C-alpha cells in the first residue's frame, strides 16, 4: 500500500544520508 511505499522510500533516503555522513566523517578523520 501507500504507507509501505512511503516507508520504503524513507528507508532508502535514510540509508543514502547515513552513507553520506559516514563518507564525510571518513574524510575528516583520514583525509579524502
UniProtKB/Swiss-Prot annotation:
A single Gene Ontology CC term: extracellular region
Disulfide bond entries: 27-32
Localisation per UniProt entry: Secreted
Tissue-by-tissue expression: Expressed by the skin glands.
Pfam families listed in its UniProt record: Antimicrobial_2 (PF08023)
Gene Ontology BP terms: defense response to bacterium; defense response to fungus; killing of cells of another organism
Keywords: Amphibian defense peptide, Antibiotic, Antimicrobial, Disulfide bond, Fungicide, Secreted
Family membership noted in the UniProt record: Belongs to the frog skin active peptide (FSAP) family. Ranatuerin subfamily.
Known function: Antibacterial activity against Gram-positive bacterium S.aureus and Gram-negative bacterium E.coli. Has activity against C.albicans.
Designated name of the protein: Ranatuerin-2Lb
Amino acid at each position: 500500500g501507500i504507507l509501505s511505499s512511503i516507508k520504503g522510500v524513507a528507508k532508502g533516503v535514510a540509508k543514502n544520508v547515513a552513507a553520506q555522513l559516514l563518507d564525510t566523517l571518513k574524510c575528516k578523520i583520514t583525509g579524502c
